[in-house]
Amino acid sequence: MKRTVGLLGILLIVCAGFAFAAGGSHSGGSQTGDVVFWTSHGPPANGTLEKIVNNYNATNPAVKVKFVQVPGSETDNTALMTAVRGGTGPDVYMLDRFIVAQRAADGILEDLTAVINKVDPNFKDKVLPFAWNEAQFRGKTYAFPFDTDTRGIFYNIDMLRAAGIDPAVMDRSKGPITIDQLREICRKIDTKDAQGNYTKVGFIPQYGQGWHYTWGFDFGGSFADLKAGKVTPTNPGVVAGFQFLYDWNKEMGVQQVQNFISSYAPPNNPPQNEPFITGNMAMMINGDWMVNTFERYAPDMHWGVTYIPVPKAGDKPTTWAGGWSMVVPTGSKRIDGAVRFMTYICGEAGQRLYFVENGNAPTLLALLNEKGLFPANKQYFQETLGFTQSRPALPVGALYWDALSTAQDMVVQNVQTPQQALQQVINQVQPQLDKFLPLQ
């Protein structure tokens, strides 16, 4: 608590002299009017974000923050890029942290290095190392880390019991189960109707947070060699993870899996209709935010969470962490006010409320180490931060993600082999990465 309060206190002291932070081109910019804050987050996260804004405005009446929800996603920042290039961008934008490097390379983010060094030269030591690293590009800082998250396999206890499976098999004190064990469990749960369509499934590996990074890391893969300046989607571990996706979908039936997802998890599916909640899916890979979803929409559901299944017995568990950040888009005329708000929302007050209401873990070490902050049903996620991996911070991070996602679609549909699909990722991404070499 004291460390972040100190950070805010220092900011307030030096705020009057913050013209240095923006550079000469902004030194004469207007510091009047609202600070405009954009996010692409929808419910329930946007409600919590708006509450943080309201709390800030209540104690900072001189320059208020205007909360605006805009279209977008993790890698689709079209609205932001169009607005910045048209001179109508926001003052603060909530950006998926792993693509900070790419947006900095695109020239649409302000360099915040001087700001952070002036406010607190030791700020980097007060947040999770991987979160800080994701906020960097070529030795400069372009973002304030906000939240983080890790992943595990959730299991519906009642569905397991109904299939004659003792839920104790999932007890994480025993370590992760193997993928072969997972498949045997699922065969006892998978149920089809007279037309051959699934009405209940044990597990669909690409569902939820079953991304390329999830399974690539799980099979020991590496996605980039930063020293060599190479993306490495054909790394044997990544290929093995994609092969697992190919084989699982082939066994279940590619079309039957697609039919199930279309029926029980269509786009914009309300949270209360999540197939894990409705009793149509027994297990899924997902993140810590789901705990709050369960509490809100299925408080009586019996569930557990444990390590992502591993290829073979004795393998160490894996997970990966994501998370978001706050950035100042290029051209902001209210950088002083923007940074003041960013220090609040990314400080203890903002991160604490976001964790309590939305479930995403904080990046501030002071909060992560606070005794009693993590309730029992979230302690798994606190534990996994000790061994989590993170996506490589690349100036083509969004492009790489999208290319991997396309490859994953081709593989789960059994249209291409993993090697074919992942070679296309190299062909698409590496020439773009070459433009930014050397990376280190």
Regions found by a protein language model. Name each.
Residues 1-36, 58, 420, 427-440:
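Short, low-complexity disordered leader/linker segments with a strong preference
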Residues 31-42, 63-68, 92, 142, ...:
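Short, well-ordered beta-strand elements
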Residues 42-64, 158, 404, 422:
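Short, polar/charged alpha-helical segment
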Residues 55-127, 140-143, 161-169, 274-275, ...:
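Extracytoplasmic "Venus flytrap"/periplasmic binding protein-like
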Residues 58-66, 250-255, 295-361, 406, ...:
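Extracytoplasmic/periplasmic substrate-recognition and gating elements
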Residues 97-152, 157, 161, 180-181, ...:
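Hinge/lid segment of periplasmic solute-binding proteins
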Residues 126, 130, 299, 306, ...:
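Long, aromatic- and glycine/proline-rich binding clefts that accommodate carbohydrate-like moieties
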Residues 183-190, 227-266, 308:
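Glycine-centered hinge/linker elements that transmit conformational signals in sensory
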